[in-house]
Amino acid sequence: MVKDLKQEIITKYQLHEGDTGSPEVQVAILTQRINHLNEHLKIHKKDYHSGRGLLKMVGARRSLLNYLKKNDIERYRAIIQKLGLRK
């Protein structure tokens, strides 16, 4: 992921100035990485090593979303809606 793109995502989803570790920011960054890797795997179908990394990232994102859902349902709904993860 390009440094500028990552910084842009952080500024878009941060809760306050200097916030880089909130669940919203982490989920947004993971979503970008997942989408990028998904495009890579459409071209390189036999890249099993990257496929495993993709599954680990999806699991990490799922864990963060579960944490948000359990602790603050409004923030969970907001991030899901912003990123378009659920229908």
Curated annotation (Swiss-Prot):
Q: Name one GO biological process term.
A: translation
User: Which Pfam families would you find in this protein's record?
Assistant: Ribosomal_S15 (PF00312)
- Say which domain of life the source belongs to: Bacteria
Query: What cellular-component terms does GO give this entry?
Result: cytosolic small ribosomal subunit
Give the record's keywords alphabetically.
Ribonucleoprotein, Ribosomal protein, RNA-binding, rRNA-binding
Q: Which CDD domains match?
A: Ribosomal_S15p_S13e
Matching InterPro entries? Ribosomal_uS15, Ribosomal_uS15_bac-type, uS15_NS1_RNA-bd_sf
User: Is Ribosomal protein one of the keywords UniProt gives this record?
Assistant: yes
Among the GO molecular function terms of this UniProt record, one is:
rRNA binding
| Functional description taken from the UniProt entry | One of the primary rRNA binding proteins, it binds directly to 16S rRNA where it helps nucleate assembly of the platform of the 30S subunit by binding and bridging several RNA helices of the 16S rRNA. Forms an intersubunit bridge (bridge B4) with the 23S rRNA of the 50S subunit in the ribosome.
What protein family is recorded? Answer: Belongs to the universal ribosomal protein uS15 family.
Question: Subunit structure of this entry?
Answer: Part of the 30S ribosomal subunit. Forms a bridge to the 50S subunit in the 70S ribosome, contacting the 23S rRNA.
Record-given protein name: Small ribosomal subunit protein uS15
Q: Which organism is it from?
A: Ruminiclostridium cellulolyticum (strain ATCC 35319 / DSM 5812 / JCM 6584 / H10) (Clostridium cellulolyticum)
